Amino acid sequence: MTESIKREFIENAAEIGIDLNDKMLSSFDIYYKNLLEWNAVMNLTAITEEKDVFEKHFLDSLTITKIVSRETLCKGCTLMDLGTGAGFPGLPIAIVFPNVKVVLVDSLNKRIKFLEDTVQKLGLSNVTCIHARAEELSRNKKYREKMDFCCSRAVANLSTLSEY
């Protein structure tokens, strides 16, 4: 990542109470490069400019700290990201908060393959990737009512999503 984007990312994260260390910054850089590589073969995101990805995907994903306390995220909890797509917001949360057990769920197996590859490259042991539809997974006793938090971006309207 360029120095100016790095500096801006660090400053913007600090504004929402997140101190990014070198390991986290390196992970976001690897994530970004892997996203571009896979996006060339399959459509993961229309947003590909480095500045935009860091602002509109990575930083936006971390705004969960406006709703869930940093203390809760730091001490550990479980979070399911329904319809995660390219891993937003779940993967950025997993990078910054390693004590959060993140379950990434998507209905397209090719996106799960990308996510598994990214998780492996980042060495994240706190992430599980699941190929499933939300409405099917909601009936699975292994996951039903087992998560502390659930998040989603651009999957369905809230009333539909809350049924899952």
Which residue ranges define each predicted feature?
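Class I SAM-dependent transferase core
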Residues: M1-C74, M80, D117-V127
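A generic alpha-helix surface/boundary motif
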Residues: R7-F9, G87, K113
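Residues at secondary-structure transition points
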Residues: S26, T48, D52, L59, ...
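S-adenosylmethionine
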Residues: C77, N99-V103, S107-Y164
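Conserved S-adenosyl-L-methionine
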Residues: D81-G85
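Conserved SAM-binding loop of SAM-dependent methyltransferases across substrates and taxa
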Residues: A86-N99, E163
